[in-house]
């Protein structure tokens, strides 16, 4: 749907839920409209209210997306374990939900948790979309967290090659990985490139000044 229709969708779904409170689709579309408006609290409330009306007859595609977005929202609010539970539910309904697999794997890697599981989930995403820079970056970062630096370099280089938007995160990861592979000059070069895109990043400034990887 078009962005300008979001408020109309919210109003329609609110009315429809009064007449048919057991229809999961109304909670889904209302939640997604709130999400598109960046109204995350209202979106999360809509999704939480909708959980109770999910049945075995519900659309796996919709329910999977339902839990995926819910997981993203919960993680943004710092509710890590609730987010992981939502991602688990998402993957029960659709085991090959690539977006969920990537986000779940990346968040686990950032926390340094369940790295073997994260690697398995992330590998599915790069198998499905081998030129997706975001997915390649996630996989590279998981290998980095596993101290598999030479392997991680292979995938971060693929991520950098396919990164059409020149993400500061991917570029910074490239610098981190290069540094742990012993390539200090290229590490500093990538950190400097990342800083151009994210000039307020104090950790990047320290990395460049010290010419050293700093764990966050």
Language-model segments: what does each one mean?
Residues 1, 35, 68, 75, ...:
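Position-specific recognition of the canonical hydrophobic site in helix A of tetratricopeptide repeat
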Residues 4, 38, 78, 112-113, ...:
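Residue-level detector of the short coil/turn that links helix A to helix B
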Residues 21, 55, 95, 130, ...:
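Short coil turns that delineate tetratricopeptide repeat
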Residues 26, 60, 66, 100, ...:
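TPR alpha-solenoid repeat register
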Residues 29, 62, 69, 103, ...:
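Canonical tetratricopeptide repeat
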Residues 32, 72, 106-107, 141, ...:
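Residue-level recognition of tetratricopeptide repeat
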